[in-house]
Structures are given as structure tokens and as C-alpha cells.
């Protein structure tokens, strides 16, 4: 996301910003709204590496600003990190292609007591997969009984407690 209104190109959001500023709404409050609702935040150039403009172009500028985190968050860095988001998704896609239960299995949502955890099963024939995801910012404890299962995919180096899900 961008902190300066000058970095945004979305005409509708720029008009909203102008109208709300005229009403006296503070810049910081409007930027918080833009962070969550403006399409420009998802339109920034792909960050391929840590070269200028994230390796997206050798030109003098991009049509919209590159996220300043491109020095640390980019494809080249993610490819070398076994626990990066890119590496995790590659593993997840490989697992999905290999296990038909993840493609064709019947989906059953599991009501969970923790608001950050999404839990469900996929079942087909004699195969069953339990999927637990913590979409919060903090570790989250789940209370589901796990029997005869095998952990096949995770995004942390070390699992100390199988009932404590780390944040994604």
C-alpha cells in the first residue's frame, strides 16, 4: 500500500479522498481506508528481484509505484527460502496434484471456537484430509482431536505443539 495520495492512480479513490478531505477527514484515516479498498494496492509491478523497480522494467519508471519492500520481498529471494510464501504454494500445488482427495473430496466445514482458524475436511473413498489454517496475526490454539494423522504440509521450520497453529 502507499502512504502518499500522490502514489494512487485509481480515479474513484482519488475523488473519494478529495471529497472526504474537504469534509475534514484526516489524511491518515483516509489512507487507512485506501489501504483496504483501493485496487491500486494489488496492481503494483511484480517484484522479481532487488534491482531497481524490482526487476519489472529497465525503463525509467513504472506506471504505478513499486512497493518499497521489493528489496526484501521478491521472487528471487522467495525462490531461495524453503519457508517462503512462494515455496509453500509450490508445495501446496504439488500436493494437490498428487492427492485426489484434495481435488475431488467432499468438503465439510468444521465449526471452530477460535475466530482466526479455518478448519475443514476433504473426504473421498478411504482418504480423508484435515486442513487447519490460522489466518490471524498471532498463534492460535485449536481443540480438534487428531487421530492417526500425518502432518504433510506446513509453513514453519519447527512444530513444537501440533495444537498451536502459527500465523500465516
Residue ranges and their predicted role:
Residues 1-129, 135-140:
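Loop/helix patches that line or flank the sugar-binding groove of alpha-linked glycan CAZymes
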